[in-house]
């Protein structure tokens, strides 16, 4: 289903509710931010350029839905979306990735997105062209009496009568799969022989490395070779080749750059890891502040150089998130705080939320396991009491060890179904019911022993 970016906030909220339990405040904020992007596009030109997106900072412990909200939002908006960890960046001048690299990566994703859309649009034409090329190989236009060409035709076929009607008959045979066992010889492009180039050094070198690699690829022309393969394989190869020919890369690049600038979304995870704790200004704190100062112009609005052209970041939406266990949002430099005007606090998840997470979303964990085991002919069913027991144990383990939110459910459910998953393919009974007692039998010892649960759950 194609989702339009002109969804109303209520419609966006309803879509997010299908996959994410709770966190109404965070979902409202991103729904409004998405609608504001559409509103900006309707504003007349002079004022439109002045309207900047209202960046969001989401505060909450791990496993409460911060990343999932941003990811689902991007799919709803059909926007280029990239998730990066702020802690992976280093200050300009140090070894590591600089902050501009996330914009370059965003452009690459946008190009891939637009190119895939264009390929879907021209897929029918590319397949028709590939069919024509296959038929030309099976039905040469002029009679050739060499052994190789005779082998390609059925014994009863008359090569000299290969007119349009014969070609159409063969086309139908090709589509019906009657020629699947035939072999044809096609010209395929060999993989590039250009040497791999790696530039080691300070940050900002990744774009230079990419440019050097492209230059080497152009210096070494692509080689082709004759390859013998069956008709279906040849059809796949030729369809891809025809798609590459038909895709207008100039249009793709232009549209990708436009989408990056106008509707790109950058999710900055672990923003709290680059916050200076308590205003300290020495040692690693200096480097953290340096990363913040490098982030500032990008979030503020800057022009980033990429190998496809210049990209303005003025209208890219930035969504930052962090647990802020040690540092606080106020520990970020004031200028960066000002660039994230919307702050949303996500609530910790308890037993009730865990029960809902296991049952309500369309991609709920229990539904995933039911579908997986159905492939082995096993009908899996969870009793309500079993769901409650799983949620209770997940909460207990979170409280006694590390708090990892809903991610704990993956570990607990996997442990509960460990024996069944191993024996499913050899089971004689087709139905399996997970009861509360079964959950306790599988987990009681581990959940009670804190040392064990620390390592297993």
UniProtKB/Swiss-Prot annotation:
Molecular function per GO: ATP binding; ATP hydrolysis activity; peptidase activity; proteasome-activating activity
Subcellular location: Cytoplasm
SMART domains tied to this protein: AAA (SM00382), ClpB_D2-small (SM01086)
Recorded superkingdom: Bacteria
GO CC annotations, alphabetized: HslUV protease complex
Residues annotated as binding ATP: 21, 63-68, 269, 335, 407
Major subcellular site: cytoplasm
InterPro entries: AAA+_ATPase, ATP-dep_Clp_protease_ClpX, ATPase_AAA_core, Clp_ATPase_C, HslU, P-loop_NTPase
GO biological process terms on file: protein unfolding; proteolysis involved in protein catabolic process
Keywords from the named record: ATP-binding, Chaperone, Cytoplasm, Nucleotide-binding
Family: Belongs to the ClpX chaperone family. HslU subfamily.
Protein role: ATPase subunit of a proteasome-like degradation complex; this subunit has chaperone activity. The binding of ATP and its subsequent hydrolysis by HslU are essential for unfolding of protein substrates subsequently hydrolyzed by HslV. HslU recognizes the N-terminal part of its protein substrates and unfolds these before they are guided to HslV for hydrolysis.
PANTHER family in alphabetical order: ATP-DEPENDENT CLP PROTEASE ATP-BINDING SUBUNIT CLPX-LIKE, MITOCHONDRIAL-RELATED (PTHR48102), ATP-DEPENDENT PROTEASE ATPASE SUBUNIT HSLU (PTHR48102:SF3)
Subunit structure: A double ring-shaped homohexamer of HslV is capped on each side by a ring-shaped HslU homohexamer. The assembly of the HslU/HslV complex is dependent on binding of ATP.
Protein name per UniProt: ATP-dependent protease ATPase subunit HslU
Organism: Desulfotalea psychrophila (strain LSv54 / DSM 12343)
């Amino acid at each position: 289903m194609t989702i339009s970016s002109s969804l109303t906030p209520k419609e966006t909220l309803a879509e997010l509710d299908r996959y994410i339990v709770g966190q109404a405040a965070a979902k409202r904020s991103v729904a409004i931010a998405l609608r504001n992007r559409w509103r900006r596009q309707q504003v007349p030109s002079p004022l439109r350029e002045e309207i900047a997106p209202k960046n969001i900072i989401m505060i909450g412990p791990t496993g409460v839905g911060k990343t999932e909200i941003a990811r689902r939002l991007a799919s709803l908006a059909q926007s280029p979306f990239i998730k990066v960890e702020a802690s992976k960046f280093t200050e300009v001048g140090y070894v590591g990735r600089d902050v501009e690299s996330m914009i370059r990566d965003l452009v690459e994703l946008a190009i891939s997105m637009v190119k895939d859309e264009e390929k879907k649009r021209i897929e029918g034409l590319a397949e028709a062209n590939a069919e024509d090329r296959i038929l030309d190989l099976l039905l040469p236009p002029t009679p050739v009496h060499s052994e190789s060409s005779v082998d390609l035709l059925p014994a009863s076929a008359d090569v000299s009568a290969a007119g349009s009607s014969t070609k159409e008959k063969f086309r139908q045979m090709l589509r019906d799969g009657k020629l699947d066992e035939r072999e044809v010889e096609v010209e395929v492009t060999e993989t590039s022989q250009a040497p791999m180039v790696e530039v080691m050094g300070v940050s900002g070198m990744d774009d230079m490395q990419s440019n050097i690699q492209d230059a080497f690829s152009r210096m070494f022309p692509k080689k082709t070779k004759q390859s013998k393969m069956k008709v279906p394989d040849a059809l796949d190869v030729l369809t891809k080749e025809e798609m590459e020919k038909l895709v207008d890369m100039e249009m793709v690049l232009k549209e990708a750059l436009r989408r990056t600038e106008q509707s790109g979304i950058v999710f900055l995870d672990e923003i709290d890891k680059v916050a200076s704790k308590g205003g300290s200004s020495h040692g690693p704190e200096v480097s953290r502040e340096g990363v913040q100062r490098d982030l500032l112009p990008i979030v503020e609005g800057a022009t980033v150089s990429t190998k496809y052209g210049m990209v303005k970041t003025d209208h890219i939406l930035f969504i930052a998130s962090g647990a802020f266990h040690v540092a606080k949002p106020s520990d970020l430099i004031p200028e960066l705080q000002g660039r994230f005007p919307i702050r949303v606090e996500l609530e910790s998840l308890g037993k009730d939320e865990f029960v809902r997470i296991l049952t309500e979303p369309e991609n709920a964990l229990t539904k995933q396991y039911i579908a997986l085991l159905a492939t082995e002919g096993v009908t899996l069913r969870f009793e309500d009491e079993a769901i409650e027991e799983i949620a209770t144990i997940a909460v207990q383990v979170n409280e006694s060890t590390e708090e990892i939110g809903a991610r704990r459910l993956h570990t607990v459910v996997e442990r509960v179904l460990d024996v069944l998953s191993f024996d499913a393919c050899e089971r004689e009974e087709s139905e399996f019911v997970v009861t509360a007692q079964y959950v306790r039998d599988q987990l009681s010892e581990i959940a009670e022993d804190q040392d064990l649960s620390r390592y297993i759950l």
